[in-house]
């Protein structure tokens, strides 16, 4: 039940790690990302579990933790089940875009072993940033896409959407159908 889509990040991590082996870091910061050192089958790992929407603090927390793991060659397990980055101008002003770019660069630069477990939603830029791993494992029923449905249909069905009387409703209808299909 811990890996069910929408599960709290710490519950998703607890379903995979050895019992009572987790030492959480940065617990009071970036609450929608869980970061901990733990063991899996007796082997030390760094766990990053992302849930809900990620604000600039969540992204900064994950980035710092992955850099720490990489510095000591601790393998990183990333559990992805998130609705993406917080879509708000205030979060962007607070550094959301900069931190998201830093997170993507941190995962790309890390030379330690990286495993991404796609447990629920892994859509859009957050998928690209968090699932940049040596091995990706998708749980049955998860949603994986490099583009958000609205962005995908605006490219795939551009002419059809532009020809409609109501562009917004046509885009939303196509996006819903695309999300159900993919």
Question: Each PLM stretch: what is its role?
Answer:
Residues 1-182:
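Ligand-binding clefts of soluble mixed alpha/beta catalytic domains
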């Amino acid at each position: 039940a811990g890996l069910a889509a929408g599960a709290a990040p710490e519950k998703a991590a607890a379903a995979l790690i050895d019992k009572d082996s987790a030492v959480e870091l940065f617990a009071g910061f970036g609450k929608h990302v869980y970061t901990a050192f733990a063991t899996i089958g007796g082997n030390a790992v760094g766990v990053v579990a992302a849930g809900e929407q990620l604000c600039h603090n969540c992204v900064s927390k994950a980035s710092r933790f992955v850099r720490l793991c990489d510095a000591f060659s601790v393998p990183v397990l990333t559990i992805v089940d998130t609705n993406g980055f917080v879509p708000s101008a205030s979060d962007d002003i607070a550094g959301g875009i900069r931190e998201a770019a830093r997170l993507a660069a941190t995962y790309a630069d890390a030379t330690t072993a990286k495993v991404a477990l796609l447990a629920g939603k892994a859509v859009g830029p957050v998928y690209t940033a968090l699932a940049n791993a040596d091995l990706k494992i998708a749980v049955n029923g998860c949603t994986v896409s490099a583009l958000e449905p609205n962005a995908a249909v605006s490219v795939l069905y551009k002419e059809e959407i532009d020809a409609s009387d109501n562009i917004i409703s046509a885009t939303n209808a196509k996006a819903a159908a695309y999300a159900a299909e993919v």
